[in-house]
Amino acid sequence: MSNEHIVWHDSSITKNEYQQKNNHKSGIIWLTGLSGSGKSTIANAAARELFEQGYQVTVLDGDNVRHGLNKDLGFSDDDRKENIRRIGEVAKLFVEQGTIVITAFISPFQEDRRIVRQLVEAGEFHEVFVKCDLNVCEERDPKGLYKKARNGEIPFFTGIDSPYEEPAAPELVLDTGELSREESKQRLVDYVKEKAK
């Protein structure tokens, strides 16, 4: 069956109605950065604080999504693009339901992030660059991935033998080589609360 026979089904509840009930705007908070930069840690800590303050929030994490929805994808450039495309579409559905979606994905290519930005309305996508020098990420190496990549056990590893394209103009930069975990989380929480008004 081709897509031409599939019709979009509008929800009986509008995004505006969800936002009014939640008392905040929805949007995508897209954390991007190298493995080990702190994306997942910051995303989950910020989500916890926002949730405790009454915000409708969810986290989409790169590793978790690859256990289910994207378990069929590898790490070639094409598979990485498809990974981000799928996540963008899922995040868009959450935005339409009035939710603040915090994503934690390496998402190494600028073009892929640009495409996700275009899925939602202006002002609903917020690119957050979780900046951290490669050597610091390698020192942290919480999953032992850099060591494996350096030993040739993991091909196409971002930062080692696959490029990472830093955001040209992110809405927020969290330099986790300089900021503590708590400082990074608080800056993100403050940013989200300001944009969700």
From Swiss-Prot:
It comes from the Bacteria. Pathway: Sulfur metabolism; hydrogen sulfide biosynthesis; sulfite from sulfate: step 2/3. The active site is at 107 (phosphoserine intermediate). It holds the Pfam family APS_kinase. It is an enzyme of class 2 (transferase). Keywords: ATP-binding, Kinase, Nucleotide-binding, Phosphoprotein, Transferase. GO terms for molecular function: adenylylsulfate kinase activity; ATP binding. One of its GO terms (biological process) is sulfate assimilation. ATP binds at residues 33-40. InterPro entries: APS_kinase, P-loop_NTPase. The keyword Kinase applies. Its EC number is 2.7.1.25. It catalyses: adenosine 5'-phosphosulfate + ATP = 3'-phosphoadenylyl sulfate + ADP + H(+). CDD domains: APSK (cd02027). Catalyzes the synthesis of activated sulfate. Belongs to the APS kinase family. HAMAP family: Adenylyl_sulf_kinase. This is Adenylyl-sulfate kinase.
